[in-house]
From Swiss-Prot:
GO terms for molecular function: toxin activity. Expressed by the venom gland. Belongs to the neurotoxin 19 (CSTX) family. 03 subfamily. It comes from Lycosa singoriensis. It comes from the Eukaryota. One of its GO terms (cellular component) is extracellular region. The keyword Transmembrane helix does not apply. PROSITE patterns: SPIDER_CSTX. This is U1-lycotoxin-Ls1ee. It is found in: Secreted. The presence of a 'disulfide through disulfide knot' structurally defines this protein as a knottin. The lineage of its organism: Eukaryota, Metazoa, Ecdysozoa, Arthropoda, Chelicerata. The keyword Methyltransferase does not apply. Its main location: secreted. Residues 1-20 form the signal peptide.
C-alpha cells in the first residue's frame, strides 16, 4: 500500500512538472508570436503610403488591398534643364487589372 501511495505521489509530481514545462513552452510561443506581430506592425508603420515619394527608399512601399505597392520612377526635367529621377509608390497596371477581376469575382460570386 505504501508503495502504491509513493508511486502515485511520484506520478502526480512528474505530471505536474511536465505540464508546467508544456505551459512554459506555450507561453514562450505566444511571446514569440506577439513579438513578430509587433515587428510587422512597426514595419507597416514605417512603410511609404500610396502616391508618396519613395526616391530614397525604393523598397519601402506599403501593401495595398491585394499586392504591395511598387516604387514607380520617372525622369523629370527641372526649370534649369537638369534631369532628376522622381519616384512614387503606386499600383502597377497588371496589379490594377488583377484587383479589378477579383472585385468583379467577389460581386458575382458573393
Amino acid at each position: 500500500m505504501k508503495f502504491v501511495l509513493l508511486f502515485g505521489v511520484l506520478l502526480v509530481t512528474l505530471f505536474s512538472y511536465s505540464s508546467a514545462e508544456m505551459l512554459d513552452d506555450f507561453d514562450q510561443a505566444d511571446e514569440d508570436e506577439l513579438l513578430s506581430l509587433i515587428e510587422k506592425e512597426e514595419a507597416r508603420r514605417d512603410c511609404i503610403p500610396k502616391h508618396h515619394e519613395c526616391t530614397s527608399n525604393k523598397h519601402g512601399c506599403c501593401r495595398g488591398h491585394l499586392f504591395k505597392y511598387k516604387c514607380q520612377c520617372t525622369t523629370v526635367v527641372t526649370q534649369s534643364g537638369e534631369e532628376t529621377e522622381r519616384c512614387f509608390c503606386g499600383t502597377p497596371p497588371h496589379h490594377k487589372a488583377a484587383e479589378l477581376v477579383v472585385g468583379f469575382g467577389k460581386k458575382i460570386f458573393g
